[in-house]
């Protein structure tokens, strides 16, 4: 079986145990030599003779799928599958799998690290100290504040656990929320609008789909508390970035941290 392997962390020389397992399964592996997500025009010649595809963050469009007559399965190396044209894969009878929860601890911990960095203004104070300014700023104490978690899946639960350790009040919104889990762990269940209005910190852990695209829009932002900290550790398209920019400009937010942006090539830092 010939398999294309494109995730950058699964390339030779990275010491990946997962790659060793894959090598034991197939001796005909094709690797991503560009060390970045591949475009559709780069994927097609690599995939055309492959039976399997372990996919990173490549653009797996209808054009790619239709050009691959031998492809039998697409396995996403990660939880998200928004870069895969699911309808095209289904039409061609190609199953698409993912690995939910594979990096839940890492992303949940990163989310809380970002919350701490923003609440205590660590990047700002680091820069000011390096510039010889020695600004005195205590930031915001998290104890007793309310964190609203949108998406209480594997990652959201890690973030909630971290927040509980800081004695924060934890509330959550999820269309498929596990009420028994919330009751056991002291997590308040809220509707979307309620969470937006009540939270001092909002953490996004949602998949990107039609129902979540621009979920955080101008109306949602207008209903947030002044100075809300918004952390997006899911997908860029969940936030209307133009509306978020305006909110920052008008000082409605304390900070928006976007770990994922809609179009990376268009971002200016």
What spans do the regions from the language model cover?
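Hydrophobic/small residue at the entry helix of a nucleotide-binding pocket
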Residues: 155
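N-terminal glycine-/charge-rich "phosphate-binding" loop or analogous flexible N-terminal tail
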Residues: 1-50, 264
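Phosphate-binding beta-alpha-beta segment of Rossmann-like dinucleotide-binding domains, i.e.
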Residues: 92-94, 99-146, 150, 161, ...
């Amino acid at each position: 079986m010939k398999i294309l392997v494109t995730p950058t962390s699964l390339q030779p020389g990275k010491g990946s145990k997962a790659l060793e397992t894959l090598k034991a399964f197939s001796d005909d592996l094709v690797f991503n030599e560009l060390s970045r997500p591949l475009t559709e025009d780069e994927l097609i010649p690599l995939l055309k003779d492959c039976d399997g595809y372990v996919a990173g963050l490549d653009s797996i469009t209808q054009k790619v799928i239709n050009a691959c007559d031998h492809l039998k399965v697409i396995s996403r190396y990660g939880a998200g599958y928004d870069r895969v044209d699911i309808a095209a894969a289904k039409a061609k009878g190609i199953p698409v799998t993912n690995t939910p929860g594979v990096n839940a601890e890492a992303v949940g911990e990163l989310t809380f690290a970002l919350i701490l960095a923003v609440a205590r203004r660590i990047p700002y104070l680091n820069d000011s100290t390096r510039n010889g300014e020695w600004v005195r700023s205590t930031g915001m104490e998290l104890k007793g504040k309310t964190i609203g978690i949108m998406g209480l899946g594997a990652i959201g639960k890690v973030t909630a656990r971290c927040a509980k350790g800081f004695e924060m009040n934890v509330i959550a919104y999820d269309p498929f929320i596990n009420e028994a889990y919330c009751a056991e762990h002291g997590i308040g269940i809220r509707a979307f609008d309620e969470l937006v209005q009540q939270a001092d910190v909002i953490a996004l852990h949602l998949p990107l789909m039609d129902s979540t695209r621009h979920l955080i829009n101008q109306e949602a932002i207008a209903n947030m508390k002044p100075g809300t900290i918004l952390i997006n550790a899911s997908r860029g398209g969940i936030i209307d970035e133009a509306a978020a920019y305006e909110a920052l400009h008008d000082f409605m937010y304390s900070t928006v941290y976007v770990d994922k942006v809609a179009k990376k090539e268009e971002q200016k830092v």
